[in-house]
Amino acid sequence: MSHLTGTRVSTFNESFLNENEHDSNAVLMELDKGLRSTKQGIQCEAVVRFPRLFEKYPFPILINSSFIKLADYFVSGSNLLRFWVLRVCQQSENHLDKILNIDSFVRCIFVVMHSNDPVARALLLRTLGAVSRVIPEKQQVHHAIRRALDSHDTVEVEAAIYASSCFAAQSSSFAISMCAKISDMIESLQVPVPMKLLLIPVLRHMHHEATTASLVSRLCMDLLPKYPAQSFVVAIIDTLTQLSSRTLVGVPGQLDVLLDFMQDLRTPVRIQVLRSFNELAGRQSVHAWPKPAIKALIDRFELCTNSKEQFLFLSILLKLSECPLTCQQLLREHRVALLRLCIQCISKLDDYTTATQAMAVLSVLVAFGLKKKGSGEQVDDILHMVNLHMEGLLLCTAKRSECTRDLRRVLTYGIRITKANAEFGTSFIGIVTNSLGDKGAYPPANAELMCEALAGLCEHFQLRKYAFSTAEDLIVDENAMDTDELPPPKINPMLARLPLILHKLNTIIDQENCDQQLRSVEILSSLVLQTTMGCYLPQKVVQCFEKCLGRLNCWTLYRIARTASRYGHHYVAAHIYTKVSQIVISDHMHYFLVALSQISQAECILNYGLEYAYMRDNYAPKVAPEPLIPLMKRLEMASNLYQQALASLRAGSSPQHPCTFQLEYLKIRAQFLQTLHLAVTVKNAQVIVPPPAIAGSLAQNSRDYLQKFGHVTNQLRKLVKALKACEETYARLYKSSFDADHVTLEFLEVAEFQCALFAHIIESICYATPPEPPVFLTTGDHPETRYFAASCQRMEQMQKNLPQEPANAKTISNRHLDVIIAQIEIITKTPLCLPRYFFQILQSTQIKLSVSPQPRSATEPVNVQSGSNLVIKVEGVLQHFSKQKKHFRRVESVQLSLTSQLITPPPRSSQELPKQGANDTVTLNQIVKPQRDFLSGSFLLPISNGGHFQVTLETFVVDENGITWCTGPKSSMVVRVLEDPSKQGAPAPSTSQAVGQTRRF
């Protein structure tokens, strides 16, 4: 049936990659079964599955046995099987150092070198090259490669060249010994030209020593006049550039060579020269550029005859501008020449790629000049030219679907100038919004880019709006009066463009094909919500989002609601969550959305003093709303809703999605609201619970002056303990969030500081000598966290309203408690911006441990003889996953902490006394560094006494900055120490004989 349906049928299990069904040994047995098959296709199919097996189970024992097995089949199999073994070695490069018997592996496959089949020998040479990283100094292999270079078979020689390139990159001795051999082959008349072109790139790896690199450079320079053909010149220049960029010593000389070849009339040679310039302009080698080289390079711009060469030339200037040292030199000495050069490229109406690249060069120069003090006047003319041409380039590239990359370049560098000059940013926002809001049709990709650019501009101005007085870009007037008031916040120019953005959003939603522009709808919605962060949304904005409910799918609606929660617009979020929760089919999703809806409703009560149901029916009433809910009632209702959200979230969690961070965060938030409720209770109780008559004598006896104010003093101190408990809980949640994004970690830092600050304010009231105030370590690098931090700054300013009293004459009055209530009002009326990690996991890092010895069953302990040491071996695998191109943080090392605690002491006789000073708890720590995502460690646990011990292994992750994260797994087992019969106590002597009677033996 298989040949009729076209379905491939395998005789061994194909579902071995399912981790829940098989372990590594079972998978290896399945693959071994395929290798032993008589059909070559099944054998090859089994071989190609090994790289995935190594990724899933990167244990040295498994990898070693697998490669030994593959070596046997490499020797006995066909060339097709050898080819797939070669592919396995190439794809499993990260796991080659886990081959324990690498000598046996090489010895086994090296037998093929004596074969009469040149293809088999070629496959062997390529396999040896693939594993060269773990056998760099194998002299036998070096000799085999040298002999293979003299072969008369082209396939074998090409394989030997490949192996030479691999070994030259790993072995210094091989590179030195092969230098003369390769030189002779290149100059030999018997070696064909294509083979010589393959030999030249081998020389680029010979940079292990300065003498070798110098020798190879001279060899290449000697080859240039001997082989003036285009292909040879291109290959030699590329090789010389690679050598110079790695040694850095030869960069000035290589620049002179490249400048000479810029005058070559052959276009491919000039393009290679420009690419070499671009390589040498990188971060590693740009500091080695001499000053005359930059001037000589700019003078040779006229030699670039076509658009591709001009684009490459501008790319070199862009890289030079990114380095502060060379950028300053360009502005001081070559500003006029650069400006003339870039204007010439921008004026080309038929090549927008080159024009936008020239605009990028000018933008980098402007941004650098504006940020550097005293250099602003140098870039005024450049900024004028940027203002003159930016709008034209934006309009020309936005309407062409083939210019998406060019449009991205214009928008990116426009945002870069905005971060250095707010005035330019205001005009740039007007340009982009006017272009987006006109009636012209844009390709969907270009429209999305402009929406993303507006979001980036809005983020920058929101950061400026809520910037601290000590933050960057905030000019402090020395002549201003010193007052307690905060400086007025800066205005976000995006607010003035909000009607135009809303009009564009409504236009897209009303279109019949709005499903094709969902991404633009999401970005524009995010832009509106970010612009109005901290504000009460106008009715037109709410009506626009209500219109989305009937036009968009559930996933897009959820993303909009998620953005609303992240920017503190909880009414819109609750409205969308409630609607979507009634549509979804999955129970887990339903309860998750219900929990989010309850969270948003709780925050609505805290922020606005009105229930969500009332706001839904009377969002913009024509008459004054009913009296707001009192503060105590608000906190009580919000706490109840958070408890309901906790129950809903537990119902929505599953073993695959445990929602650990979400549950912990909701617990802390509910705990914090209950603490605020306690503070309001203390304020209300002060009126009805006056100090007792004996309060003065109690204060004198306890030597605590503030005890004379009675009940309120103890309640405030109890409140301080509750706030410090919240602070510690936030700190623990921070330490356990290794995979969280930067916004979430900043949010947790600010939340922790808010608890510490509020506790310090109350301490300054209820203690005679309060401790030092907490230090604010972050001001927020994102709009939502900086807005949160700005509320903490308002709390610090509010603290100044406390009466200034000496330590020995402090009082606790209504004025003090009114300040506490005002602090709570600031906390509750500041919209909560839920952290991103609450909704999205952009990075996942898991550690899977294997601990030995293991008990026979989960209920049985591990038996150990008394007086011996227990050897505990730990092996683990790191599994990474990231949706971003760059990880937020990586695992540098893993700390293993082993704790042994006596839980059941051994039985003792009535006359035996316990040992004095005996420690029943042992803690051992070890830091291991993962090798290719595999870690191993061992402990020698001393156990001297009998009984039962609880052995617990905890894992902590240490990132590249040395920060320890409590995010690893935890495993435990029970160890039973067996009593040694030979060491049991002898029976007590008989007391039947009379005292003093001599015993006879």
From Swiss-Prot:
Segments of skewed composition (Polar residues): 989-1001
Bilayer-crossing regions: none
One Pfam family cited in the UniProt record for this chain: INTS7_N
This protein's GO CC annotations: cytoplasm; INTAC complex; integrator complex; nucleus
Record carries keyword Cytoplasm: yes
Gene Ontology annotations of biological process type: RNA polymerase II transcription initiation surveillance; snRNA 3'-end processing; snRNA processing
Protein location: Nucleus; Cytoplasm
Recorded family membership: Belongs to the Integrator subunit 7 family.
UniProt function note: Component of the integrator complex, a multiprotein complex that terminates RNA polymerase II (Pol II) transcription in the promoter-proximal region of genes. The integrator complex provides a quality checkpoint during transcription elongation by driving premature transcription termination of transcripts that are unfavorably configured for transcriptional elongation: the complex terminates transcription by (1) catalyzing dephosphorylation of the C-terminal domain (CTD) of Pol II subunit Polr2A/Rbp1 and Spt5, and (2) degrading the exiting nascent RNA transcript via endonuclease activity.
Miscellaneous notes: The name 'deflated' originates from the 'deflated balloon' appearance of mutant abdomens.
Protein's UniProt name: Integrator complex subunit 7
Gene coding for it: defl
